[in-house]
């Protein structure tokens, strides 16, 4: 049949199927493809589908031992990007059976593992994923979600306020705790470890945990409110990370924190499971995200990393500020903020949402506006993010 001769063959013979009707259980991906000169877009799109599923560069006899039609990724639609020359959006459908249940790690290994170094492509960006209910239901999702968090904190109808303790590196644990107390006593709901505060020589993690817990309880007693400090549990090994989370639980604090991209999705999912089992909230920082999402034509858009985090598990995630940036960015940011919080999000290309996403009652994640914001930004922030958000100053 076509496409099964010996030698190097065109991917589009097998993997470009414009007549394909997507299934409700398929994982759908939208890639922004920039082919090398002379490579037709159909071939580039099919190459992406092939390399991220069952394809290899030639036909091998073991292909006959399985059903390619059942397991292959399919490029089912290609459209040029308006206003860009030689850029196309390639839509790829992956059969559900290609992925291990409950593993964001495996999902990314399959979809973006190999294909980004591909010779036929000058650049490639994963713009969006549609996660079908059949797959999202194999994930626990956020440890608690927005509603449970508000119940735990007894704080309703407003954004939560936080700040990061500065200078982020160099304070002793005792002085760090002092700063935490002053901030919480002054009226903030949360204070935060900086993402690079782990366990350095000038402040070991256990000392910090103890002094922060003391600050927390003192501020709680004096204000009559529930307070939190995001204790950064990120560590060099997953076991050490869980050890720190256990310590936080034993101290009775409400929330811990993790750098999910540098720590990795496997570690993050383990921590999220621990947090749900033990009543800890989980604050997620996105350190390293710009390495992956900053280039417009290559990498992975943050909305995909945000969806992955909602599946892997986290109660808060940093999601940019919008303030003072371009207007277009505002709509795109609001698009993935909705993907984090809402249950059902309609396809809306103007906001960068390529697929309708149904989370089938998976708990939501609070977006955190953080980085370079101050009190003059408050009106804009409340208008943009609404009540269900964390405004993180400092």
UniProtKB/Swiss-Prot annotation:
GO MF terms here are: magnesium ion binding; monooxygenase activity; ribulose-bisphosphate carboxylase activity
Residues noted as binding Mg(2+) in the record, renumbered to the chain: 192, 194-195
Q: How is the cofactor bound?
A: Binds 1 Mg(2+) ion per subunit.
Q: Which domain of life is it from?
A: Eukaryota
Give binding positions for substrate.
114, 164, 168, 286, 318, 370
Which residues of this protein are catalytic?
166 (proton acceptor), 285 (proton acceptor)
**Subcellular locations according to the entry:** Plastid, Chloroplast
Q: Which reaction does it catalyse?
A: 2 (2R)-3-phosphoglycerate + 2 H(+) = D-ribulose 1,5-bisphosphate + CO2 + H2O; D-ribulose 1,5-bisphosphate + O2 = 2-phosphoglycolate + (2R)-3-phosphoglycerate + 2 H(+)
**Chain positions found as N6,N6,N6-trimethyllysine:** 5
Q: Give the UniProt record's GO annotations in the biological process aspect.
A: photorespiration; reductive pentose-phosphate cycle
Major enzyme class:
lyase
UniProt site (Transition state stabilizer): 325
Q: What is its main location?
A: plastid
Key words of the record: Calvin cycle, Carbon dioxide fixation, Chloroplast, Lyase, Magnesium, Metal-binding, Methylation, Monooxygenase, Oxidoreductase, Photorespiration, Photosynthesis, Plastid
- Modification sites for N6-carboxylysine: 192
Cofactor names from the entry are: Mg(2+)
Per the record, its GO cellular-component terms are: chloroplast
State the EC number(s): 4.1.1.39
List the InterPro entries: RuBisCO (IPR033966), RuBisCo_large_chain_AS (IPR020878), RuBisCO_lsu_C (IPR000685), RuBisCO_lsu_C_sf (IPR036376), RuBisCO_lsu_fd_N (IPR017443), RuBisCO_lsu_N_sf (IPR036422)
Q: Which NCBIfam families match?
A: PRK04208.1
Q: Which family does it belong to?
A: Belongs to the RuBisCO large chain family. Type I subfamily.
Further information: The basic functional RuBisCO is composed of a large chain homodimer in a 'head-to-tail' conformation. In form I RuBisCO this homodimer is arranged in a barrel-like tetramer with the small subunits forming a tetrameric 'cap' on each end of the 'barrel'.
Q: Which PANTHER family does this UniProt record tie to the protein?
A: RIBULOSE BISPHOSPHATE CARBOXYLASE (PTHR42704), RIBULOSE BISPHOSPHATE CARBOXYLASE LARGE CHAIN (PTHR42704:SF19)
Q: What does this protein do?
A: RuBisCO catalyzes two reactions: the carboxylation of D-ribulose 1,5-bisphosphate, the primary event in carbon dioxide fixation, as well as the oxidative fragmentation of the pentose substrate in the photorespiration process. Both reactions occur simultaneously and in competition at the same active site.
Subunit structure, briefly?
Answer: Heterohexadecamer of 8 large chains and 8 small chains.
Name the UniProt record assigns to this protein: Ribulose bisphosphate carboxylase large chain
The gene designation is rbcL
